[in-house]
Swiss-Prot record:
One Gene Ontology cellular component annotation held by this UniProt entry: cytosol
One GO MF term attached to the UniProt entry: DNA binding
Cell compartments where the protein resides: Cytoplasm
Coiled-coil residues: none
Name of this protein: Probable transcriptional regulatory protein PTH_1024
Length: 243
């Protein structure tokens, strides 16, 4: 992985999880359930729910699954009571790690996550130990291949729509926004015919640490193991591995 591009991480992960579509559906359903429980079942007045539904549709989750998840969140249907938790810790080489969890059994999940850290050369930390190294941002990714309009026009369009920053990566453009502006900027880009590869609220690292050798290999294994855990929704880390 070169740099700390979120999109390079997403692409690396995509091939691995494509064969686990059932797990993807489950994770997206949990996000919808929690979003509906916290902000109600109307996506027009619940920004988080609207974003979760969009991600589910992009992953080809059937509409009936989406509706059931909303109804579970609002209490119209019964189901597990999922709790949203953020875990923080350190990986090999001192890399900072944040994990978004949705679980119906906090104690079980905490033990399993702690074991994953220990097995891969890291340690689960206290709340707040690394959160200060990250900033919550809206993240929009546009792939360079076949991208319209050109880079300068896309940057101007994004910034005029309210984006905070625009960055050209090796094979993509990454646009960051305030979390509350994500849908507005996304709508402006899509309205101009821009094809969006990813749009989500993410924890963006403010600084990164370079890893190599054994530390790089162990960090990769740690992130993979965390992402494979059923209760993990997202993993964020501030490391980079040079190609």
């Amino acid at each position: 992985m070169s740099g700390h591009s979120k999109w390079s991480t997403i692409k690396r992960k995509k091939a691995k999880v494509d064969a686990q579509r059932g797990k993807i559906f489950t994770r997206l359903a949990r996000e919808i359930i929690v979003a509906a429980r916290q902000g109600g079942g109307d996506p027009e007045s619940n920004v988080r729910l609207k974003a979760a539904i969009q991600r589910a549709k992009e992953a080809n989750v059937p509409n009936e699954n989406i509706m059931r998840a909303i109804q579970k969140g609002t209490g119209e249907l019964g189901g597990a009571n999922y709790e949203e938790i953020i875990y923080e810790g350190y990986g090999p080489g001192g890399a900072a790690v944040m994990i978004e969890i949705m679980t119906d059994n906090r104690n079980r999940t905490a033990g399993e996550i702690r074991h994953i850290f220990a097995r891969n050369g890291g340690s689960l930390g206290e709340t707040g130990c690394v959160a200060w190294m990250f900033e919550e941002k809206g993240l929009i990714v546009v792939e360079k291949k076949g991208s319209e309009p050109d880079e300068d026009s896309l940057m101007l369009l994004a910034l005029e729509a309210g984006a905070d920053d625009f960055k050209a990566e090796e094979d993509s453009y990454e646009i960051t926004t305030a979390p509350g502006d994500l849908q507005k900027v996304r709508g402006a880009l899509e309205g101009a015919g821009v094809k969006i590869a990813l749009a989500e609220v993410a924890m963006i690292p403010q600084t990164t640490v370079k890893l190599e050798g054994d530390d790089a290999e162990r960090m990769t294994r740690l992130v993979d193991a965390l992402e494979e855990h059923d209760d993990v929704q997202n993993v964020y880390a501030n490391y980079e591995i040079e190609d």
